[in-house]
Amino acid sequence: MDQPVMDCPVTLVIKAPNQKYDDQTINCFLDWTVEKLKSHLSKVYPSKPLAKDQRLVYSGKLLLDHLLLKDVLRKQDEYHMVHLVCASRTPPSSPKASTSNKSMGTASISRSSSEHSGSASPASIRQDTSSTYPDPRPGDSIRHRHTSLMYNNLVHSHPFSYLRQEYALNPPPGQASPSTFPAYSAFTPLQMMWWQQLYARQYYIYSQATASNQSPSNGENAQPVPRPVINSESPPPNPPRAPPNVAPEMNPNIQMNAQGGPVMNEEDINRDWLDWMYTVSRAAILLSIVYFYSSFSRFVMVMGAMILVYMHQAGWFPLLQDEGQQHARDNAAEVNPDHVNNNDPQELEHRMDEGLQEEHNNNAGGNVVARRGVLASAWSFITTFFTSLIPEGPPQGAN
């Protein structure tokens, strides 16, 4: 029963993992061993692999040499797929590799001939390359031509292109001048654009730093140097006298509105009943404290002092304000004596006459000035003392 089964052939489909060869169909018998199958493959397989370099894999298992095919193959399958893996020590040379070697040899021969001639140009090299490697499609030739033009523009516009030109024209001493400079650089067009942007940015930063370092020195040098005064024989003519400032003095404490006029104190005009109640309550508390914790005479004195302070703040005593403005004008005249020095001789004589008259009047009015100074000092002391007793409200916000 087993002998007919052993004699019937089975079909094996040999598959190569690298897909270099097509699937090979081989007929064999079940009583063959794996070693005998390998020896048969070394004769009929296209690559003629050696038996010791073959590895057979069936259903994910490596087949050993001593196994029989009847013990390994499944009987219900009509075709048995076997994978052949060869560890070839001398792989066969493919026709594509030989073609590429020939083309590389042709390109190297053309390049060496151009170097020996010394008159080859990048255009001729590109023509040789294009003739060696023909374009499969016309669209690729147009794209290649556009890429080469863009590359040439980038090479010539690169900031370091002048270095290559200078090196080609004037080589360093001790070195022979090269016949031709390399037509192609190691950088791609995108890298060349990136280098160009980086160079422009570094140059811009350097120019800004240089300008910032030179600006203070230029400012210092621009300061005028005082020239020595040269005594001339004829004195310069007198400059025209400036007209006297006849403009009336303005109140320095006036508040200006944002629209261009004096600020109207709206708090005094539009004060509601709550503000008046708050003011009256503060005054009543102060007066009650003085009335209950002191005598009647002190209460009257405090009332009178408060009334005087209120009248002074309301502007009922303009004499003291006029004296303060007069002192301010006198101080301004002392600070600016240049106006007096620039006057004419006639005006100087007029001022001297006025000074003599003032000396005569000073003797008569000395007592009045002294008495007025004592009264002003006493008044300022009293007002300062009593105003310090009255608490001040919060500062008003500026309009």
Swiss-Prot record:
Pfam families: ubiquitin (PF00240). This is Homocysteine-responsive endoplasmic reticulum-resident ubiquitin-like domain member 2 protein. PROSITE patterns: UBIQUITIN_2. Keywords: Membrane, Transmembrane, Transmembrane helix, Unfolded protein response. GO terms for biological process: response to unfolded protein. Residues 234-246 have a biased composition (Pro residues). Residues 107-124 have a biased composition (Low complexity). PANTHER family: HOMOCYSTEINE-RESPONSIVE ENDOPLASMIC RETICULUM-RESIDENT UBIQUITIN-LIKE DOMAIN MEMBER 2 PROTEIN, HOMOCYSTEINE-RESPONSIVE ENDOPLASMIC RETICULUM-RESIDENT UNIQUITIN-LIKE DOMAIN HERPUD PROTEIN FAMILY MEMBER. Residues 88-144, 211-250 are annotated as: Disordered. It comes from Xenopus tropicalis (Western clawed frog). The keyword Repressor does not apply. Could be involved in the unfolded protein response (UPR) pathway.
